[in-house]
């Protein structure tokens, strides 16, 4: 969430920044409630000063044999009034926090202003899309024809938009996961984590999934827990409520998890194949860094994700999201989009974001600076990568005229085979 002091001191700046997101946010309600809070605090402090003043009169009045009945009556009333105002203050604090939870992060000054993904800014491309001299197949047809994907049985045991990986397909999926995690841990300096996927409401709140996106989540009502939509939630919240010792940053974590999303607002989009499933696998990278380094760390994070596609030798491009396409918690995001031959376009396979101190304030993650003073960390995360989409990109880009699929050389030590036919 945003710093209430920043909003209070620079309301016009915040309003102008949030206009770029094209939404309606309760800034004025927040400021009015904040003003009310300060008035109540001032009133409480005045009453406490009066209470203290009257209390000091008691010993002298008793010493002089004076009647203290009226004095104690006044002290009792002051005490009751202070308690009532303290209760009001708790309600006001809750109201302020609710407003803050509804307000998204402010876009970084270098984020392009735009309405939707058509106005994202292309930063760079890598590789050239392969020119096929035969009629290509989409990954869902390739997978079924080679008996490595089974959508029909997945629907039978669950519902639509679930997938079963089978035989060499299951091996290829596992190979991708192992390859990604090994790259992040052995070469890029991340520590591997294995976390739960059932999340408490406070964890979901910490990274910004709720309350804004509650309807997109799978919720276990009986236990009041959510299925994690991304490893960003458990991994970021691992350090929730902690003050990290001076010199402990940066911290890099990576995790492979199952992810679960209702995709409530995506009806009719990418409903075939592996692109938009309710359950999917993903390797996530999460960073906790000092504020002064966070944008350099964002570039490194994005490069870490890009390296996977470079080693797989699959073309991709990197775009900087415009303000209208930017995620709720993000100050800046790069999307990596992989070339998908059947779509004849680039498709998102990773989002790499700098949240600045937005998530850290919600989850209360701090570190001690050089003066030993607690400060909020900056958090970043990125997909490294979405495995289902990467699987789809591999089999589409490596399909052969005879219907077989070559295995990228970098994966062969993980699969134990070099072709699926």
From Swiss-Prot:
Tell me which UniProt keywords the record has, alphabetically. Aminoacyl-tRNA synthetase, ATP-binding, Cytoplasm, Ligase, Nucleotide-binding, Protein biosynthesis
Biological process per Gene Ontology, one example term: seryl-tRNA aminoacylation
Q: Which SUPFAM superfamilies match?
A: Class II aaRS and biotin synthetases (SSF55681), tRNA-binding arm (SSF46589)
Source taxon at top rank: Bacteria
From the UniProt record, list the reaction(s) this protein catalyses.
Answer: tRNA(Ser) + L-serine + ATP = L-seryl-tRNA(Ser) + AMP + diphosphate + H(+); tRNA(Sec) + L-serine + ATP = L-seryl-tRNA(Sec) + AMP + diphosphate + H(+)
Q: Where does L-serine bind?
A: 230-232, 284, 383
Question: What GO molecular functions are on record for this protein?
Answer: ATP binding; catalytic activity, acting on a protein; serine-tRNA ligase activity; transferase activity
Q: How does it assemble?
A: Homodimer. The tRNA molecule binds across the dimer.
Q: Which family does it belong to?
A: Belongs to the class-II aminoacyl-tRNA synthetase family. Type-1 seryl-tRNA synthetase subfamily.
Protein name, per record: Serine--tRNA ligase
The lineage, from the top, is: Bacteria, Bacillati, Bacillota, Tissierellia, Tissierellales
